[in-house]
Each structure stands twice: as C-alpha cells, then as structure tokens.
Amino acid sequence: MNLIETNKALLSFYASNPKVVLAVPVWSSPKAHEYDTSISFLYLRTNDSDYIINFNHIDAQRCNLIKFDRLISPNTLVFGNRYLDTKGLDYEWVYFEEYGKPFILNEFAEEVYRGYRSDFKYLNDCIPLMRWYEVLKRIPLVSDIKEWYRVYSDSIRTLGRLEGAGVKVDEENFIDRFHFNNEYLPKGFAYTKYNPYTVTGRPSNRHLGVNWAAMNKSDGSRANIVSRFKGGTLLQFDYESYHIRIIGKMVGYRFAEGETAHEHLAKYYGVSTEESKALSFKYLYGGLDEFAKGIPFFQKVDEYIQSVYQKFVISGRLTTPLYKREIPFQRIEGATEQKVFNYLLQALETEINYKKIEEVLKCLDGRRSKMILYTYDAFLIDVHPTEKEWVLKDLKFILERGGFPVRAYEGSNYDNLELIP
C-alpha cells in the first residue's frame, strides 16, 4: 500500500497518470450524511497496486489538492459516486447487478469498529489506517460491465444532487418526533438518502431513522418539514393516475382528454370515481377477472402481460423499456405473469422519474428554489417567494410532458398541502 500524505506527492501521483480501477472514499463520520461530513481518506486501486490519499485522518499528514477528474475515468468503479460527482461508475450499482445484493461499506467493514465508541461523530478519522486498509483491500472488483450500468450510474448521481439540497425542518419538533441527534442536523437541515439498489431500481429513502419515502400522513410528522425561505412555500406536484397512464403508454391505449384516467375507467365499471380507484388497484396488482378483460383498456393490458411473460420465460430476463436494463429470471421470486408485469411497471416508473428529476434539477439550476423530495408519484419543491409562478408554470410543463398530468398542492409545511385550483 502506498500512502500519499503531501500535496507534492499527490501532484506527482497525478502526473503519473494512474489507471484507477476502484475508488473508495472513507468519510470522517460513519453516521452523518455525506453532505454533512468530509472525506477522511481516499482508497484507490490500480491493476498492480493500491494507494491511500489522506485528507483528514490523524495517522498521517494531510493533502488538500484533490482533483477527481485526474483520478477517475469513465470506467473507474467509484463507491458513493453520487457524492463525488465524478464521471465514473457507481460501484454499489455494479455490485448489486453482479451479486444481487447491496454493498454496504459500514457492514463490510464492521470489524474495524470493534472496540471503538460508536457515538463519536468523526470516528473514521481515528481508526488506524492500516486497520482500514486490511478491510478495503478485500473489496471485490466487477469486470463485466454492462451497457446499462452507465445509464443507471448517471441516474444515481442525479439522486445525489437531489439529496444535496437538504430538507429544512422545524428543529425542536423534528428532534422530538424522530428522536433525532441534533449533531446531525446542520443549521436545521436534515438529509434524505435514496437507496436504489433494488430489483426494480425503485429507491427507498431512509436516513438516521427517518423514512422519507413513507412518512406518516396522519400523526403530524410531515408538519416538521418547512420552507427554508422567509415567505417561502412548499409546492408538491402529484401525478394523476400515474401507473394507469404509464401502462397506457406501454400497451398503446389513449385516454380521453378532459377527464382523469380513473374517471375514464369508472364509466366502464359503472361506479363512482373513488370506487374506480379501488377496482383499478385490484385489477392491476391482483390480476384480471373476466369482467375486467371485457374492458378495452384491460384487454390491451392482458395481451401485453402475456406477451411480456412469454418473452421473459424464453429469454430468461426482463428488459426495461427505457434503459434496456436486464433483470435475470432468478431475481424475481415466484415469477407469475402478474408479478413480472408489476416488476416491469415499477422499473419503468422509476426510469421515467429519473429522467424527470434530471430535467427538473436542470431547470432549477441558477434558481433559489430547490427540489427536496421525490416519492414515486410526487415531487416536492421548496419554493422561493419570488419564483412561485415560474415554478408552477415551468416545472408543471416539464412533468406533464409525455402525457402525464399533474396536480399542484401548496402549503407552509409538508402536512398542510392544499390543492391549487
């Protein structure tokens, strides 16, 4: 192992044009969000050697001239790539695709923490570098890089940008409600953390005990999320009948303009719109009965489900429509026609959302307003008071493009959002 602990040595290393195959930043805090801590040191591996570049660890002198573009190539596997914003490949995604399970560094490196106090925020700066090295050198490489790994790496990097906005909270009540350690609440901001390492790619979102993706709607938890701006507001864009409309795109079915998809299907069911929602949910996720198969929309859905399943069984994989990701047969346990279709639907929803998030973040570049949360069929924006009308117009246009209507809700906090007529 080669230790680089001076700027002179680091510049010399850059000049050698190293071909780095793996990069693993170890952050000073094992618990804090990456946007709330610093890099302790960077572990690098080439084909014939490995290196540690020190920045904040107490075992060595410190460098401060990090230039990731001089170290990371498009083919470098980078752990936590979304927080370094490099052009490399997301190591965790590549690992998940190869082994079918997530790679969690703190669990992989569990042995380095034995005998140390877990409540010290900057613990990773204190555990001996050689102890770290003995673990990091065992991180497995993946050499078979599929084409879609890069597309997903780019999308996961987009999630990192979304996390970076932070979420302004009512500190006292947030700490009380979630038993949150204020040491991890810089200037009243909490951080989301998306976990996209799932079979369908759809991310969960949990950090330090807060489940952002499934925050309770009835116990006041959401009231703790507020705007960071004086006179600011929270705007949420909700997709209308999102899954039904995605399915319509998949099967080639057009819904009439001027009515919601649920209103459209209610006419065939002969029930109210509210009852229509429940029936559609039953048919889409529980299977179609003979009555449903007599409805034009579900006739197309039934044909599509059978076609997808037949291709899945023959090829041994499920290929997503947008990113062309291949999900192996064995990753879908108990693969029935309905289950395979549901996996495909969830994967497509996720890929559409990744593209939409990228467009929204690009649109918000240079603006004060921030996108702060994504929950499958809803996007939450923290809006500066001078940008409200612009957000309502421009972001609504982006989200609805492609035939996906949204409704906008506004509130002073995440709990009191009301529909904007």
Give the ranges of each region predicted by the language model.
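Short glycine-rich phosphate-binding loop at a beta-alpha junction
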Residues: D69-R82, D238, E290, L373, ...
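C-terminal polymerase-core module
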Residues: G287-G294, D302-Q346, D382, T386-P421
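Conserved nucleotide-binding/hydrolysis micro-motifs of P-loop NTPases
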Residues: V78, S241-H243, N413-Y414
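Catalytic palm subdomain of template-directed nucleic-acid polymerases
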Residues: K121, R161-E171, L288-D289, F379-K393
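Conserved DEDDh/DEDDy metal-dependent 3′-5′ exonuclease domain
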Residues: N2-E5, Y14-P140
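Acidic, glycine-rich two-metal-ion catalytic cores of nucleic acid-processing enzymes
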Residues: N2-I4, K8, S16, A23-D50, ...
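Helical catalytic core of nucleic-acid polymerases
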Residues: G88-K146, S155-A165, H207-L208, N216-E337
